[in-house]
């Protein structure tokens, strides 16, 4: 049967629709976050905090030095800064925000994990206590942790939630309430029982973010082509103030970024 022009046109349109996702495929941002200084850490005596026999059992041995708990504030390897959060800041993705399930943090051997990450405004922040000490009658059912969260901007800090988790497997699930995120605030977590338990999280509004690896390198895939503003955040650099970097992402290609923090 002879095909008319309308049928042929439908075929062309169908082909165009199938090809569309590939035609508008984004690009990739790769790079390295560098730090001009040296590694820095804080020291805490276990004896000054609850559970001085349990907390030193942390399997991350680099965090335990005899009777002291080490909190790495800045970790530098070959000039690269571990744990920096890099995010595209000029895209608000409603679908991502609506579908975001929340930020998950665990308290494990007196450590909040992950140490750095992201949060989404008004979406939930989950903390689960994994700790119990069968050798301590007071902590058999659970090591008491008290996750206390803050919104921080410069010298300003305000409580978001402050909830005790007394037993193993106890959880909290609270929305991230931010009032100064447009001004550059970040979300801070600290245990009121164990000061060395800390975590820091950057507010984001799209899925285009990454946490720098041990050597400071990162990769963000599927970023819409065009010019974008990146923000780079690390709690130990510049008192947590964000550093901005401009990047031009090529269609289907890569843009390499060098972000230098001080």
Locate predicted features.
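Extracytoplasmic copper-binding redox domains, predominantly the cupredoxin/blue-copper superfamily
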Residues: 24-262
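Positively charged n-region of N-terminal signal peptides that target proteins for export
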Residues: 1-4
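Bacterial N-terminal signal peptides
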Residues: 8-20
């Amino acid at each position: 049967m002879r095909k008319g022009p309308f049928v042929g046109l439908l075929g062309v349109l169908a082909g165009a629709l199938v090809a569309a996702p590939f035609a508008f495929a984004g690009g990739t941002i790769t790079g390295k976050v560098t730090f001009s200084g040296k590694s820095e850490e804080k020291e805490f005596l276990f004896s000054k905090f609850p559970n001085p026999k349990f907390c030193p059992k942390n399997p991350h041995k680099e965090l335990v030095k005899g009777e002291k708990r080490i909190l790495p504030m800045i970790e530098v390897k070959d000039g690269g800064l571990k744990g920096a959060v890099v995010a595209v800041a000029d895209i608000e993705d409603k679908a991502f925000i609506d579908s975001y399930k929340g930020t998950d943090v665990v308290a494990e051997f007196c450590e909040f994990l992950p140490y750095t990450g992201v949060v989404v405004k008004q979406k939930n922040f989950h903390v689960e206590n994994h700790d119990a000490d069968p050798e301590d009658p007071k902590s058999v059912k659970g090591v008491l942790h008290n996750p206390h969260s803050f919104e921080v901007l410069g010298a300003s800090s305000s409580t978001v939630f402050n909830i005790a988790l007394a037993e193993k497997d106890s959880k909290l699930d609270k929305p991230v309430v931010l009032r100064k995120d447009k001004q550059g605030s970040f979300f801070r977590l600290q245990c009121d029982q164990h000061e060395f338990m800390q975590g820091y999280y950057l507010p984001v509004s799209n899925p285009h973010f990454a946490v720098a690896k041990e050597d400071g390198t990162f990769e963000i895939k599927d970023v819409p082509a065009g010019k974008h503003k990146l923000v780079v955040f690390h709690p130990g650099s510049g008192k947590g103030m964000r550093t901005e970097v401009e990047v031009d992402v090529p269609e289907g290609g890569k843009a390499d970024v060098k972000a230098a923090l001080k």
